[in-house]
Structures are given as C-alpha cells and as structure tokens.
Amino acid sequence: MRNSAQSYLKYINIINIFETLYLFYSTGLDTLEYIDSTYKNFIIMYVNQYLLYGTTLKYLSVGEFFMNSLTIFINSIREIMTSTTMVMYAIFGMFIFSEILVFSTFIWGYFHLRLSNPILLAELNVEAYLQISDVLNTGSILVSIILHRVQESANFETDFFMEQLLLIGFIFLSLQNDEYSLILSYVNNYWMTLYFFILTGLHSLHVCAGGIFVLIQSYFYEGDGSQRDEEFNAGVYWHFVEMIWIALTMLLFLA
C-alpha cells in the first residue's frame, strides 16, 4: 500500500513538472522570477508530500532532505541580504550568543573535572601568557581606532588599520603555535591537557574567523560613508574573542 501511494505521488510530481514547463513556454513570463518562485514551491510541495510517508529514516530520502535544507538556507541568505540594520544586529547577536553557549559548555566541563579532581599545580611563567593577552588587547585598541576612522570616512587610514589588525591576528596564532609545540604533554595524557587543547584551539579558530570578517568588511568598505559604523560587526566579534581569551587566561593559567 505504501509503495503504491509513493508511485502515485511520483506520477503526480512528473505531471506537475510538465505543466510547469508548458506554462513557462506558453505565457512568456519573466524567466528568473518565474523559475525561482515555481521551483521553490515545487520543492516545498515535493518534500512535504514525501515526508508524510517518511515515518522512519528508512523511507526518508537523503536527496529530499538535502533539497529542503538547501532551500531554507538560500531563503535565509536572501532575507539577510535585504534586512535592515536592526535585524542584522539581532542575527549577529544570536550568533555571538550561540558561540558563548559553545564555550560555556567546555568551560563547565573543565570546572567539573577540576573541582572533582584536586591537583597540585606547579608554578607557571605567567608573563608569557600575559604577552599573548597584550597582543589581543592591542587588536581591540585598533578596532576602536577603526570605528572612529569609519565615522570620519577615512579610507586610507581605515584600510591601513585593518591590515594591522590582521597582522595582530597572525601574531597571536604564531604565539599559540609556539605554545603548542613547546608543551610537554599530549592530548591523551591527561584530562587537563585535553581541555587545554579544546579551549585554546577553539579560540584560535575564532581568531581566524575574526580575521576573515575583517577581510570581508575591508573589501566592502568604500570610504564614502556607504558603510556606517554600526555595520562594523567585525569589531564586535573581535571584542567577543578578546573577552573569551581573558576568561580562558584566568581559568587555565591564573586559577
């Protein structure tokens, strides 16, 4: 019974495709708008019909699931591209909030193991870790300078300070790589080493993402007032990365 119903739905969908093509060639409507709206509705209809019978993963096609996810992703990108500044703030705020939840999960795991396994820690050379913090602090100062230059539409100075901010990010990643190469323990040796690599490695990935954001915003910046200071979301993201590093410094090195 299930197979006959699915065969009938496939037959209906094939008929719908031919009806769509015939209507397209007979009416002569605008090509892009017509194809976009027609096939978007067809994909939604196709997935909804088949998901009625997809009660288990056995009857759910991977292709249908992929097409549905792709349609949602494309529509979300289009909505973001045509949204106002307040909507962009809300989207970016939720993105940063989700990142905070990710770091909070691993920090809570570290706290749980740290409190349940009291250990005697050796003295550390704190100055080396504070130097890494100074690098990110310098980057935050550059972000504040960039915001002032964006308000003044200073094209050359803004591009120069964005390049310096990228250089700061590379210096931080270089120092982090030196720390990994000189560490005397490995991932599987001890739980503290595992969480150290997870937290600092995840933070380094976010530094790379911040550098990519700066590159994107520097590409779209024209220096004629077309990009307002409230749209410089890369600065907000960089401050978020710095605050995470301060929390990790207090947690891993000073506590």
Swiss-Prot record:
Keywords in alphabetical order, please.
Membrane, Mitochondrion, Mitochondrion inner membrane, Translocase, Transmembrane, Transmembrane helix
Q: How does it sit in the membrane?
A: Multi-pass membrane protein
According to the UniProt record, one GO cellular component term is: mitochondrial inner membrane
UniProt-listed CDD domains? Heme_Cu_Oxidase_III_like
Q: Where are the transmembrane segments?
A: 12-32, 42-62, 91-111, 128-148, 155-175, 196-216, 234-254
Q: What EC number is given for this enzyme? A: 7.1.1.9
The record's subcellular location field reads:
Mitochondrion inner membrane
Q: Which GO terms describe its biological process?
A: aerobic electron transport chain
Catalysed transformations (reactions): 4 Fe(II)-[cytochrome c] + O2 + 8 H(+)(in) = 4 Fe(III)-[cytochrome c] + 2 H2O + 4 H(+)(out)
Top EC class of this enzyme? translocase
Stored Pfam families:
COX3
Q: Which InterPro entries match?
A: Cyt_c/ubiquinol_Oxase_su3, Cyt_c_oxidase-like_su3, Cyt_c_oxidase_su3-like_sf, Cyt_c_oxidase_su3_a-hlx
Q: Which superkingdom heads the taxonomic lineage of this protein's source?
A: Eukaryota
The family assignment reads: Belongs to the cytochrome c oxidase subunit 3 family.
PANTHER family for the chain: CYTOCHROME C OXIDASE SUBUNIT 3, CYTOCHROME C OXIDASE SUBUNIT III
| UniProt subunit comment | Component of the cytochrome c oxidase (complex IV, CIV), a multisubunit enzyme composed of a catalytic core of 3 subunits and several supernumerary subunits. The complex exists as a monomer or a dimer and forms supercomplexes (SCs) in the inner mitochondrial membrane with ubiquinol-cytochrome c oxidoreductase (cytochrome b-c1 complex, complex III, CIII).
Role this protein plays: Component of the cytochrome c oxidase, the last enzyme in the mitochondrial electron transport chain which drives oxidative phosphorylation. The respiratory chain contains 3 multisubunit complexes succinate dehydrogenase (complex II, CII), ubiquinol-cytochrome c oxidoreductase (cytochrome b-c1 complex, complex III, CIII) and cytochrome c oxidase (complex IV, CIV), that cooperate to transfer electrons derived from NADH and succinate to molecular oxygen, creating an electrochemical gradient over the inner membrane that drives transmembrane transport and the ATP synthase.
Q: What is this protein called?
A: Cytochrome c oxidase subunit 3
